[in-house]
A protein has these predicted regions:
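Extracytoplasmic
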Residues: 184-192
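Active-site-adjacent loops and short helices of periplasmic peptidoglycan-processing enzymes
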Residues: 23-183
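Sec-dependent N-terminal signal peptides of Gram-positive bacterial secreted proteins and lipoproteins
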Residues: 2-23
Length: 192
């Protein structure tokens, strides 16, 4: 009986160990039939091995658009992660003028002039509905009342984490001169 159990256990062990290898080969075959990537650029990294598994135009500068909010989020969390509920900010009126100067159909979180919100709510407003006004409120606070100061902080942080082709000009991505690459976007998201 012991011999039978040992043989059965060995067989089960071999099957269990062989399944991942079989699945690995199968997924490689499936990738040949995957739909073509239509994005202008992509950069995929295996986070366990730090090996680039897919690269398409990863160094080509493109408009950062709302990915800009990821850098605003990174700076917010680096400085205030433990104070997200204890600090509340009031929306300054001038930020709405900045937003509407750039776009009349900008995405917002419907934060009104003069309303007060916690940093946590502003973070959610930036990330979920892509609220441009939330990014500007955070930038105003962190930049000491100056959006330009905050944008300088964004560009300094981008350089510090290894971004080589990224330039920010506003905290939310409305301005088309916010530029990044797929590789630099990966570095920003990895830092988060």
């Amino acid at each position: 009986m012991k011999k039978f159990c040992a043989i059965l256990f060995s067989f089960v062990l071999i099957v269990v160990l062989a399944l991942p290898a079989a699945a690995e080969g199968e997924s490689a075959a499936l990738s040949d039939t995957a739909p073509a990537l239509t994005a202008p650029a992509a950069y995929v990294v295996n986070l366990d091995t730090n090996i680039v598994v897919y690269d398409k135009n990863s160094e080509v500068p493109l408009s950062a658009a709302s990915l800009t909010k990821m850098m605003t989020t990174l700076l917010l969390l680096e400085s205030y992660q433990d104070q997200l509920d204890s600090i509340s900010l009031t929306a300054p009126s001038y930020i709405y003028d900045l937003i509407w100067e750039q776009s009349t159909n900008a995405s917002t979180a419907d934060i009104r002039r003069g309303e007060t919100h916690s940093l946590r709510n502003l973070l959610y407003a930036m990330l979920l509905p892509s609220g441009n006004e939330a990014a500007y409120i955070v930038a105003d606070y962190m930049g000491g009342g100056s959006i330009d100061n905050f944008v300088a902080m964004m560009n300094n942080e981008a350089a510090a984490i290894g971004c080589t082709s990224t330039t920010f000009v506003d905290p939310c991505g409305l301005n088309p001169n916010n530029i990044t690459t797929a590789r630099d976007a990966y570095l920003i998201l990895r830092a988060l």
